Each structure stands twice: as C-alpha cells, then as structure tokens.
Amino acid sequence: MIQGTTSDAGKSTLVAGLCRLARRAGARVAPFKPQNMALNSAVTADGGEIGRAQALQALAAGVAPHTDFNPVLLKPTSDRGAQVIIHGKARMNLDARAYHDYKPVAFDAVLESYARLRAGYDTVLVEGAGSPAEINLREGDIANMGFAERVDCPVVLVADIDRGGVFAHLVGTLACLSDSERARVRGFVINRFRGDIKLLEPGLDWLRAQTGKPVFGVLPYLHGLLLDAEDMLPSQARSAAARGDAGVLRVVVPALPRISNHTDFDPLRAHPQVEFTYWKSGPVPDADLLILPGSKSVQRDLAWLRDAGWDAVIRRHLRYGGKVIGICGGMQMLGRTLDDPLGLEGAPASVPGLGLLDFDTTLQPDKTLKNVTGHLALPGAAAVHGYEIHMGDTRGPALAAPALTLAAGDASGGVRPDGAVSADGQILATYVHGLFDAPDACAVLLAWAGLDGAERIDYPALREASLERLADSFAEHLDLRALYAEFR
C-alpha cells in the first residue's frame, strides 16, 4: 500500500508507474483505492463511477476500469457534505458526521472489492488517501492505516521534497502512528527531487538512522507529464509557444468552486496553439473561447459566476463574436432554468439559468453513467468518444439542433442527439465529457472556435508516452528488488 505524508505527495502517480512496470513484467495487477474524495471521475466498463486516478492506473496496468478499483467515492457537494458512491452507484448525500456513522457500511464494501481483486489478480497495488497522520480521522479510518491493519498490508510512505520539509514530513508522520502502524511502514520514497543527489545523501543517511527504515528511491521531478489529475487543478495558465505566423487560440475556463472533471481540458492545455487559463478572480482575460465546465453543485457555482459578473462577461464575449462551450453542468447553466426539486445538490430550489439556450433542466435521482461514441454535428462530423456523468434531464426547443449525434447504445444500432448548437453558431452545449480527447474532434472544435490551421494532436498517445516515461524513471531510480520483496 502506498500512503503519503500529505495530499498530492505523489501516491497516485507512484501507483500508476508501478502498475505500468508490473504490466511490462507480465503481471496481472489491479489498482485499488479504498476511499477517494474527488470530483474528477470516470465511467467504468461495468457501468459505474470511480475516481479518475484509478482509471488512469487501470490504463497503466492494461486492464479495464472497474468499480472494485475504487469502491467508495465521495464527491463533495459543499464544504461539509458529499455524495456517497458505493461500488460505482450514488447512494445518498451525507454531511461529515453522518458519513462517519456510515463508515462501517462503506468498509464492508471496501473489503468485498478487495477480496474480489485479491482472487482475480496477481498483485493489488493499494493507494491511501491524504495522510495516515490525521489524528482526528483515526477512529473508523477505512482509507489508510485502518485498511492496512485490517488486511495486514505492508505500507510504503511517499513524501514530496519539492514542498520543503521532507524529513519532518516523514519522521513526523511516523511519530503520529501507533506502534503497530509504524512497524507496518516498510520504507520511504522521496518524490519530485531536483538538484544534485549527493547533496541529499547526508539527509538520507540521517533518515535511515533515525527510523531504521530504508529509502526505496528518490524520484526526480519530471516536467511535462500529461497524466489525469485526481482532483487538484493544474497550474493556473499554460501559454502557447511562439509559433511565428501560426495562429493561437485563447481559451478561458472559470475555476468553479466545485468544478468537476476538469481533465476535459488536459488536451487543450497540451495543445501547442492554445493559450489556456483557469480564471479564479480579477478581470477575465481576453478570450476567443469561453468554456463553462462541469460542476457538482450547479446552482451554487452559477451563483458564484453571477457574483463575479460572468453573465455580463459571456454576453459581451458573444456580442463581439466569441464562442462559448458548456459541458455537462456548464451546459445546464446556459439554459433557462435549473430545477432541483429533491435537493440533490443542496437545498431544493429552482433558479434561472443564463438564458442563452432555449431549454430547461431538472435534476433527477437516477444518475446517467455511460461511455459514449459518436460524431460532432459540425462540418467534418469528426468522431467523438467520451462519457456522461450527470443527473440532469434537459428538455427544450434548442435540443432540435444537437451538438453531437451519439450511438444509441442499444440493439437498434441507431443514434441519439446530444446537446445543442445556438442558431447563430456561437454556442455549443453537450453532456459529453472528454470532448477534446479525440484528435480530429479537438481540431474541428478549435477551428470552429476560430483557430486557423489547427494542429491535430493525439492526446491519448501523449498520455501513453507519459506513462512510459514515468515507468522508465521508476525503473532507473527505485530499488525495485527491495520494493518487490514487500509484495504479497
């Protein structure tokens, strides 16, 4: 089991790289995260929902994503509450205290999934959540040492040296553990190191002497990895490279407080002709394309946008010929009304949308979870592959001009419409995540948004190359013989 001294220490990436190394060695390996709290999620082959990081780890391992890889997923709906997803299906919304009482039920689901994976795979690589040293969360823990102790799993502790204080993080974490938990930690991995390793060696010697535990490796800081983030937004901006006469498209996405599935924009951030910005505050930069992203709490995030003046920003942008895309929750915001009669994303309410497309959305208790294929309803009809994760039922005249046609996914072999394109062709709305992943679709959408000579980039191939680069680095910098000796 890989645990970390902090959130974003490198647990997900370490598991992904080890999954790829195991695949290279011919082992059948399964990634596993008992409990994940994230708004980036993926649809599995068995029709459920798991954290995006586990889907990436499955790709690294060469296996189809399955709900057993992440049996408990918590999707925050507010600062104190979350939607609880068990074995891929939404069960209920709970506040923190109510979920604490529910944990025994969640732990049963965790143990069921783990037992199935142990029976079906050569190795299970487990990822912890946050830090095992959260004293206030120790009672009833199912994500870190509580799980490791229950199933007798050895632990490797990873820390991010780029944050500073790496030795305090490692030794301090051990100090916060019980004797049995401390003994379970077999050693350490130090992540994101830059500089001369010889200057670090005295610290490594001290760490070994202080703890009696080995350092399995020091991993270098790898720039430019294109890997799906578990939850944290990437750095604020990504500027296009200077390209002489080649065009550049300016894309701005509001960093909504409850933004979901922002991995939709990874292909744009990787595109050499796109100047990409996540906006949080202050004046909105000039843009050719504004994208309203998905949200786990659409009404609250729409109110946040309004408070920031984005309704006026969008209308001015359209008045001067700019383009707008709304994805999932962003699509719902573009309509006339947003109704949540059951309080699925907060208190029951009905609020006006931005009124830019003639449709209305009502949230329903049954969540749509589908992997989809289809074509853009734009010149060229480029192929699209993606997924739907939403609870919205959207209806209205604007849907008569769909943005995509999707395979119906049933025995009929037919197609179904999705989303809408405005009569003036400036607004495109869809429920489909992963809109920019397919190379041809990305190029067509960038051309629609105004980019002359849009290059075709193959983002899935770039992500695959990043996994290979990650595994190569691990093979060079980890003591794999010592690490594999801890596998059971």
Curated annotation (Swiss-Prot):
Q: Where is the active site?
A: 328, 433
User: Does the keyword Membrane belong to this entry?
Assistant: no
InterPro entries named in the record: Class_I_gatase-like (IPR029062), CobQ/CobB/MinD/ParA_Nub-bd_dom (IPR002586), CobQ_GATase1 (IPR033949), CobQ_N (IPR047045), CobQ_synth (IPR004459), GATase_3 (IPR011698), P-loop_NTPase (IPR027417)
Residue stretches making up the GATase cobBQ-type domain: 248-441
Task: Name the Pfam families for this protein.
Answer: CbiA, GATase_3
CDD domains from the entry? CobQ_N, GATase1_CobQ
State which pathway it belongs to: Cofactor biosynthesis; adenosylcobalamin biosynthesis
What family is this protein classified in?
Answer: Belongs to the CobB/CobQ family. CobQ subfamily.
Annotated function: Catalyzes amidations at positions B, D, E, and G on adenosylcobyrinic A,C-diamide. NH(2) groups are provided by glutamine, and one molecule of ATP is hydrogenolyzed for each amidation.
Name the chain's protein.
Answer: Cobyric acid synthase
